[in-house]
């Protein structure tokens, strides 16, 4: 047997960490909901992680600063803002008296039954990234405990935490919410007006790559344009490689903008209330292709594609996970209603469930009131009854007029914003 250090040139702690990651994926296939194990693609940059802070990438303190060592290289941390400085100070304070803080955490857990934040450094990870055509390596330090609160330059808290209930209907592209103070309907993962332009550029580059790949490898395609089955050899031109570099850079920028937009929306919702009520995540089901073959009124076959592109561009599950983490870590409450709640079908004026078409975005209630479908679902989630875990019809009747007036103003502002301006 050849030692792993001689064969691959890595230490045992790195091999053990990577083996645990692989076994976690195998466990999902054996005992969970996983179907197949996916290998890393050629050219992907691997993350280098050591599961022990004193081995592989050990941490040390010199001149009251954190330093890390990998082989013969010694490097520190570049602190850019006050939040990072607070995190570094918390780690330094733990390393100065680690035994005392560990004993205090254990005693608190035994006596009071909860964990305190020790800010113990757990492990370090080297994350390589390709940014603007150059390789950059970042160090991610995983710390035990909750993140430090953020403050602005004047010393005030950067984020405010509100009180009250929030009902939110998270769709594939939009989120509608109803709170004690306001109602809203906005697109997911959107910062400004640049996301639609970026998505269009991404599509154009992807099509240009496909044309170049087809022109360079005509032997791998059938006469009807489909890819041949079996083992194939692909050749890529220099033009294709340049397009791929542009496409990768654009995808990286779009992913960062999506994550920033998700964090901004989660922080804003947390400022409206401390109880968040929504439906369970179902993006994975909506992303799958339809199994049944159907025909439309013109006799043509309907496409089996569903919401895969919308989910990829808008990340509804990522937004819901970020909101859940935000509310739970800041002292709030996150509630997912049961599957039989059916907020999209209930009509509180008729006290009955009425099924609607997916294309009916605006519809009339039983008493003739015109409502927006997504907002009305969020309103029914807002009227959640803790005892029965169902819709509280009495609260729907008492709160509807106040919330409906806000919804009318919201729809008018949306129509005014989207209407074209007259030409001179």
Tell me the role of every PLM-derived stretch.
Residues 1-131, 309, 313:
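Acidic carboxylate diad motif detector
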Residues 420-424:
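A short, hydrophobic C-terminal helix/tail in secreted or cell-surface proteins
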Residues 137-419:
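Positively charged, helix-rich recognition surfaces that bind polyanionic ligands
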């Amino acid at each position: 047997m050849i030692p792993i250090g001689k064969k691959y040139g890595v230490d045992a702690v790195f091999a053990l960490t990577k083996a645990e990651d692989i076994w976690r994926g195998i466990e999902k296939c054996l005992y969970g909901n996983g179907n197949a194990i996916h290998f890393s693609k050629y050219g992907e940059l691997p993350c280098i992680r050591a599961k022990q802070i004193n081995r592989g990438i050990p941490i040390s303190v010199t001149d009251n600063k954190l330093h890390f060592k990998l082989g013969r290289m010694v490097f520190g941390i570049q602190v850019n803002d006050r939040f990072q400085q607070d995190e570094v100070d918390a780690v330094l304070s733990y390393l100065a008296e680690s035994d005392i803080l560990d004993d205090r955490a254990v005693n608190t857990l035994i006596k009071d039954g909860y964990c305190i934040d020790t800010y113990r450094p757990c492990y370090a990870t080297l994350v390589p990234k390709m940014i603007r055509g150059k390789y950059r390596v970042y160090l991610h330090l995983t710390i035990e405990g909750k993140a430090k609160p953020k403050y602005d330059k004047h010393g005030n808290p950067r984020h405010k935490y509100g009180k009250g209930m929030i009902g939110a209907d998270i769709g594939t592209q939009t989120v509608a919410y109803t709170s004690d103070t306001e109602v809203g309907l906005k697109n997911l993962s959107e910062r400004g007006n640049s996301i639609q332009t970026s998505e269009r550029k991404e599509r154009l580059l992807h099509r240009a790559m496909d044309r170049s790949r087809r022109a360079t490898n005509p032997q791998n395609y059938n006469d009807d344009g489909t890819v041949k089955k079996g083992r194939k050899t692909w050749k890529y031109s220099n033009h294709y490689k340049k397009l791929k570099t542009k496409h990768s850079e654009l995808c990286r920028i779009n992913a960062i903008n999506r994550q920033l937009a998700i964090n901004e929306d989660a922080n804003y919702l947390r400022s409206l209330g401390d109880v968040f009520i929504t439906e369970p995540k179902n993006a994975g089901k909506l992303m799958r292709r339809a199994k049944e073959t159907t025909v439309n009124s013109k006799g043509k076959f309907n496409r089996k594609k569903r919401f895969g592109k919308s989910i990829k561009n808008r990340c509804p599950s990522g937004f819901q996970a970020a909101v859940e983490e935000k509310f739970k870590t800041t002292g709030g409450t996150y509630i997912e209603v049961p599957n039989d709640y059916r907020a999209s079908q209930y009509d509180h004026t008729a006290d009955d469930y009425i099924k609607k078409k997916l294309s009916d975005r605006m519809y009339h209630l039983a008493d003739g009131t015109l409502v927006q479908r997504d907002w009305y679902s969020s309103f029914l989630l807002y009227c959640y009854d803790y005892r029965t875990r169902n819709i509280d019809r009495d609260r729907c009747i008492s709160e509807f007029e106040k919330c409906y007036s806000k919804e009318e103003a919201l729809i008018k502002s949306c129509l005014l914003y989207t209407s074209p301006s007259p030409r001179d």
